[in-house]
Design a protein with these regions (language model features):
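Long, amphipathic alpha-helical coiled-coil segments characteristic
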Residues: 1-44, 54, 126-135
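Structural secondary-structure packing elements that flank or coincide with functional cores
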Residues: 1-8, 78-135
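Short, well-ordered alpha-helical segments
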Residues: 36-41, 54-72, 84-98
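Secondary-structure edge/capping motif, primarily at the C-terminal ends of alpha-helices
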Residues: 21-33, 52-55, 71-81, 99-110, ...
Length: 135
């Protein structure tokens, strides 16, 4: 398998994890679940953070997913249930999806979008949450 094909496969794997996160969030919003399992979210962000290991283009995705993992980290019984918490996780899923899709376009030789502002805003938000949690 070529390096490009491997990277595209890793993008697909990470996008599947983002999709699972979005499905869990949607179920919580519709009231089908009382909240979202923090352990499940953290594991999914962990998988995304380790996608594309060794491929330099994945660095922004890995960094943001690792921050999101820290924000959502909790025991398997710990539930994410406030609207603010759910909104932050949705923001992370949206930006990671945008970054992953943009990487896929670039690997296929298409022009990518400028995703830097979205990534910077998410990084700032996640870092702020981590700092607030330490107080």
């Amino acid at each position: 398998m070529s390096a490009r094909a491997h990277a595209l496969d890793q993008i697909d794997t990470a996008l599947a994890e983002v999709g699972a996160i979005e499905t869990s969030l949607a179920a919580a919003r519709r009231g089908q679940n009382p909240g979202v399992n923090r352990g499940d979210l953290a594991r999914r962000f962990h998988t995304i953070a380790h996608a594309g290991t060794g491929h330099h283009a994945f660095a922004p995705v890995q960094e943001l997913a690792a921050l999101a993992e820290k924000v959502t980290d909790g025991t398997d019984q710990s539930i994410l249930h406030t609207a603010g918490e759910i909104e932050v996780v949705q923001h992370a899923a949206d930006v990671l999806s945008l970054l992953l899709r943009d990487m896929g376009h670039q690997l296929l030789g298409r022009r990518g979008a400028d995703v830097t502002p979205a990534a910077a805003a998410l990084r700032e938000r996640l870092e702020h949450m981590l700092m607030a949690g330490r107080r």
